[in-house]
Each structure stands twice: as C-alpha cells, then as structure tokens.
Amino acid sequence: MGLQEEFEEFAEKAKTLPDTISNEDKLLLYGLYKQATVGPVTTGRPGIFNLKDRYKWDAWKAVEGKSKEEAMADYITKVKQLLEEASASTS
C-alpha cells in the first residue's frame, strides 16, 4: 500500500476517533490534513471574531514547512497513536 492510500485509509479511521480527544489533537490533525491535501496555507489569517477558523488556520500554518508526504506520514502516525490511546482507555 502506498503512502497516499494509507493516508486515505487513516483519514477515514480518524472519523471514528472519540469526541474525547483534545482540541489540540484535533487541530493538529486538521493542520496536517490540510497540508497533505492542499499544501501551504495561501489565505489570510481570519479575523479575531472568527475564533474557530482562526485556530484552524493557525494549526495549518504551524505545519507549513512540511512536504505533503511528511504531512501524510505525520497524520498517519498521529491517528494511529490516538486510536491506540482510545482503545487502551476503553479496555
């Protein structure tokens, strides 16, 4: 299985993560996903009154230097970690 296919598989698995994962982890996954699928952020930072989009933009900007392949690999690693943690907490 190639990196792209594995990334797509884990993007689907990420949808099954419990709601209890931290906002920090959710934002990290968002940033890595956007970097992997779109590339570097090209839009301006949302205004102060649009906090949700501002946090998401910041998360994407934080991983700006990564290649798409690096972002995919980091995304897969993080989803695996979160799935293992979720599995351990329900055992």
Swiss-Prot record:
It comes from the Eukaryota. PROSITE patterns: ACB_2 (PS51228). Its main location: cytoplasm. This is Acyl-CoA-binding domain-containing protein 2. Belongs to the ACBP family. An acyl-CoA binds at residues 15, 30-34, 52, 56, 75. GO terms for cellular component: cytosol. GO terms for molecular function: fatty-acyl-CoA binding. Highly expressed in leaves. Expressed at low levels in roots and seeds.
